[in-house]
């Protein structure tokens, strides 16, 4: 696990990819809760 030279750390990928995913999921659930997500 220590051989990460020349490669992007997995936690960094998870963080960068996780933030927009959480945002999209939050917007989707908020939209569906507000009655706007049914159009999706």
Swiss-Prot record:
It holds the Pfam family PsbJ. It comes from the Eukaryota. The keyword Membrane applies. GO terms for biological process: photosynthesis. Keywords: Chloroplast, Membrane, Photosynthesis, Photosystem II, Plastid, Reaction center, Thylakoid, Transmembrane, Transmembrane helix. SUPFAM superfamilies: Photosystem II reaction center protein J, PsbJ. It is found in: Plastid, Chloroplast thylakoid membrane. It is a single-pass membrane protein. The chain crosses the membrane at residues 8-28. Its main location: plastid. InterPro entries: PSII_PsbJ, PSII_PsbJ_sf. One of its GO terms (cellular component) is chloroplast thylakoid membrane. NCBIfam families: PRK02565.1 (NF002722). One of the components of the core complex of photosystem II (PSII). PSII is a light-driven water:plastoquinone oxidoreductase that uses light energy to abstract electrons from H(2)O, generating O(2) and a proton gradient subsequently used for ATP formation. It consists of a core antenna complex that captures photons, and an electron transfer chain that converts photonic excitation into a charge separation. PSII is composed of 1 copy each of membrane proteins PsbA, PsbB, PsbC, PsbD, PsbE, PsbF, PsbH, PsbI, PsbJ, PsbK, PsbL, PsbM, PsbT, PsbX, PsbY, PsbZ, Psb30/Ycf12, at least 3 peripheral proteins of the oxygen-evolving complex and a large number of cofactors. It forms dimeric complexes. Detected in both etioplasts and green leaves; PSII is only assembled in green leaves. Belongs to the PsbJ family. This is Photosystem II reaction center protein J. It comes from Hordeum vulgare.
């Amino acid at each position: 696990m220590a051989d990460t030279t020349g490669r992007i750390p997995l936690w960094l990928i998870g963080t960068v990819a996780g933030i927009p995913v959480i945002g999209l999921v939050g917007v989707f659930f908020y939209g569906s809760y507000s009655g706007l997500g049914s159009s999706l």
